[in-house]
Amino acid sequence: MPSATNSKTPKIFRVTLEVADLDKAAKFYGKLLGTEGKRHPGARHYFDCGGVILAVLDPTAGGMTPTPGPKSLYFAVTDLEAVHGRAKTLNALAPYKVHGEPGGAVTKRPWGERSFYVVDPWGNDLCFVEEGTLYT
């Protein structure tokens, strides 16, 4: 896939995931991502993920019910095993299968990526992919 070099092409700068407990989410994502992030007004906690902000938001603060976000949110990482270890400590490895293999296991996928899947406590699916194996 060619890279977007056109300055008129919109770029993604923030992705929001809804959670029901902002403090718990800040701790969960802080440990999983290996960074504290930063609390912001409006029941939000931001994590800088390589120029794209992951914003965890507690909609219950405004009287709304949280709903899981996109099917999967993908992160490119340089040390896949370290992130996998943190996810395992958090008991967050995905229990489902991906292409016949355990989703929570570090696996080389049919398209060449080495990856594993995580489910956060609010039902959001995340995938972590080893940087040198990204399929784009």
For each of these PLM feature ranges, what is it?
Residues 9, 16-54, 59-60:
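Core segments of cupin and vicinal oxygen chelate
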Residues 63-67, 71-77:
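Helix-adjacent hinge/juxtasegments
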Residues 12, 44, 113-115:
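Conserved positions at the start
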Residues 47-51, 118-121, 131:
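Active-site beta-strand termini and strand-to-loop segments that position acidic
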Residues 57-61, 108-109, 130-135:
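Acetyl-CoA-dependent GNAT
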Residues 1-26, 71-73, 129-136:
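N-terminal beta-strand motif that seeds the catalytic metal site of vicinal oxygen chelate
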Residues 22, 73-125:
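Vicinal oxygen chelate
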Residues 55-57, 117, 126-129:
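Conserved beta-strand in the GNAT
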